[in-house]
Each structure stands twice: as C-alpha cells, then as structure tokens.
Amino acid sequence: MSEEFQESDIIFSDQSKISTSSRYTKLYNSRNDEKKGTRRHETAEKTSPVRIPTNNFRCLEWDTTEEEDDKTPPHVIIERRMKEQIAFSACTLKGRDLSRHRNSVLRMTGFLEA
C-alpha cells in the first residue's frame, strides 16, 4: 500500500527540515551564549556609543531685515504665468465647430497634414 500525502506535505516539505534544524541551532547557540556571557558583556562595555550628527539645517532663521516688498511668492508668479498662457471662450463648441477646432489643433501639432 502506498503512502498518502497531503498537499502541504509535498509543497512545504523543505520547511519541516528547516524548522528542525533551526530549533537545534537556537538551542546550540543559547548553550554557547551561557558559556560566553562574560565575554560579550566585556566587549559591550568597551565600545563607544554611536555618534549621530545633528541636523542644523532645521534651525535656520530667515533674515527678516530685508524689504518684504521686493519678494513675490512663488504661487503668485505661477498664477500670473498661467493667466498669460490661457485663453478662454465663454461658449462651448458643438458639432461642426468642435470638429474644425479639433482639426486645427491636430494640424498645428503635426498629427494631421494639410
């Protein structure tokens, strides 16, 4: 009679081997740590702490002595540029006007040849 397997036994067969070996490794390492516990404690005391540099760029102060009138905020500059570029039409294009407008745009961009 042949042995019957579950799907998980076939697919995850290597996991069972790893888990038993990892248990042994953990047990082995924990026994060695008990023996070497004093050495690790001594080396931990000898090492110096890690020095983390401070970020001084967060503490910058703005120079407010200059005249504020000369400076224009960036969002105002962008708004002015957008107003210059955009042209509006009050009516919506429908039917034949829309197709003419579409064709003229396609000719200008090079997608349609005249």
UniProtKB/Swiss-Prot annotation:
Give a single Pfam family match. Senescence_reg
Annotated Gene Ontology cellular component terms: cytoplasm
What is the annotated localization of this protein? Answer: Cytoplasm
Q: Where is the composition biased (Basic and acidic residues)?
A: 31-45
Question: Keywords for this entry?
Answer: Cytoplasm
Keyword field contains Transmembrane: no
Q: Does this entry carry the keyword Cytoplasm?
A: yes
Give induction info.
Answer: Slightly induced by dark, abscisic acid (ABA), salicylic acid (SA). Triggered by pathogen attack such as Pseudomonas syringae pv. Tomato DC3000.
Region (Disordered) residue spans: 23-50
Q: Name one GO biological process term.
A: leaf senescence
Query: Which PANTHER family does the protein's record reference?
Result: EXPRESSED PROTEIN, PROTEIN S40-2
Q: Which family does it belong to?
A: Belongs to the senescence regulator S40 family.
Q: Protein name, please?
A: Protein S40-2
Q: Which organism was this protein described from?
A: Arabidopsis thaliana
Q: What is the lineage of its organism?
A: Eukaryota, Viridiplantae, Streptophyta, Embryophyta, Tracheophyta
